UniProtKB/Swiss-Prot annotation:
Entry annotated with the keyword Cytoplasm: no
Top class in the EC scheme: hydrolase
Protein name per its UniProtKB record: Succinyl-diaminopimelate desuccinylase
Record GO terms (molecular function): acetylornithine deacetylase activity; cobalt ion binding; succinyl-diaminopimelate desuccinylase activity; zinc ion binding
Species name: Xylella fastidiosa (strain 9a5c)
Subunit structure: Homodimer.
UniProt cross-references to PANTHER family, sorted A to Z: ACETYLORNITHINE DEACETYLASE, N-ACETYL-L-CITRULLINE DEACETYLASE
Active site feature: D68, E133
Ligand binding (Zn(2+) 1): H66, D99, E162
One Gene Ontology term from the biological process aspect of the record: diaminopimelate biosynthetic process
Length: 377
């Protein structure tokens, strides 16, 4: 087929279920070194990270991606083996085809082609890959960003290859993301027989008014760039499984997706104050996944918009929706961040796939972005 097809197939065939890399980064580094990149392997715990750079000085453009994939689930549910790439009816099937080994392959091909034409380009072209995006995201880009900060490494622009397109390649330009804050609430009660409630304290009954207040809370109205903040309860667990036992404890997990009107500490303070109004005996454990970020109108967005319109035939929607991405760790370094990638309709699903026409177009799209940002600088 083509270079990008062959490289994507090679990556898919490596079962890099998070946090495994399965040799993806070593293979990519060998290719990049052949065209003049300096490659540094940063291993933290069981996580592999690759920091590859070409050129020097500003401006610094980072192509950000991940080599890990989510587990495929039951193999028998797939039409073909998720780690044996298969071409069918104009699509390439396999775990990671869309999220995001196709984009990683396109990054590599685009960088190689760019350097053939612009070996002495201004500034720095960097590629940052991790095997910890789909997992805990602790020893991946989060840790690499800390290392880069300590070194004083500046980053001007970051292009993440997450599958951001909705219906067709290039129809959506991600220009920011909401923050994500998770919590696990433990409410203590007193276990007892359901026939003798006066001898027990039912933590479910005690917590219901507080949970109702949490879910009814109107956090904000959002703005022209971000939707309103949302709180969703994701898990509730209590009881022994028997229907005649009042549980002694309740565990509730919830998550907030929040816009820049809030910070994680402010949200935590608000929720603690609300819970304290209900007299619960509780503990609360927080996990901050990342603060919101936003790339304002400027050179990066303008060029990305022009390039996407050229490839998709219409101006892209500019959005801050969706989940989180590793760009949340790069933005605090002062970088303007955007996300452009293939259609996301099949990601994390059985029979994940990428349209072959989109896969073939991705290297050209990324190469044009690199040229507009660095070669035309």
């Amino acid at each position: 087929m083509s270079e990008v097809f062959d490289l994507t197939c090679d990556l898919i065939s490596r079962p890099s279920v998070t946090p495994e890399d399965a040799g993806c980064q070593a293979m990519i580094a060998a290719r990049l070194e052949r065209v003049g990149f300096t490659c540094e392997h940063l291993h933290y715990g069981s996580v592999a990270n690759l920091w590859a750079t070409h050129g020097q000085g500003a401006p610094v453009l980072v192509l950000l991606g991940h080599t890990d994939v989510v587990p495929p689930g039951p193999i028998e549910a797939w039409t073909s083996d998720p780690f044996i790439p298969q071409r069918r009816e104009g699509k390439l099937y396999g775990r990671g085809a869309a999220d995001m080994k196709g984009s990683v392959a396109a990054f590599v091909i685009a960088a190689e082609r760019f350097l053939v034409a612009h070996a002495g380009h201004p500034g720095t072209l960097a590629i940052l890959l991790t095997s910890d995006e789909e997992g805990q995201a602790i020893d991946g880009v989060r840790k690499v960003a800390e290392t880069l900060r300590q070194r004083g490494q500046g980053i001007d622009w970051c292009l993440t290859g997450e599958p951001s397109s909705s219906k067709r390649l290039g129809d959506l330009l991600r220009v920011g993301r909401r923050g994500s804050l998770s919590a696990t609430l433990h409410v203590k009660g007193v276990q007892g027989h359901v026939a003798y409630p006066h001898q027990a304290r039912n933590p479910i009954h005690l917590a219901v008014p507080a949970l109702a207040a949490l879910t009814a809370r109107h956090w904000d109205d959002g703005d022209e760039s971000f939707p309103s903040t949302s709180l969703q309860i994701s898990n509730i667990h209590a009881g022994t499984g028997a229907n005649n036992v009042i549980p002694g404890a309740l565990e509730v997990a919830f998550n907030l997706r929040y816009n820049p009107h809030w910070s994680a500490p402010r949200l935590e303070s608000e929720i603690v104050a609300l819970l304290d109004q209900h007299g619960l005996d509780y503990t609360l454990h927080w996990h901050r996944s990342g603060e919101p970020f936003y790339t304002p109108e400027g050179k990066l967005r303008r060029i990305a918009r022009e390039v996407l319109e050229r490839f998709s035939g219409a101006p892209p929607e500019e959005s801050t929706g969706g989940g989180t991405s590793d760009a949340r760790f790069i933005a605090p370094l002062g970088a303007q961040c955007i996300e452009i990638g293939p259609v996301n309709a099949s990601i994390h699903q059985v029979d994940e796939h990428v349209c072959l026409a989109d896969l073939e177009a991705l290297p050209d799209l990324y190469q044009l972005l690199i040229e507009r940002l660095l070669a035309d600088h």
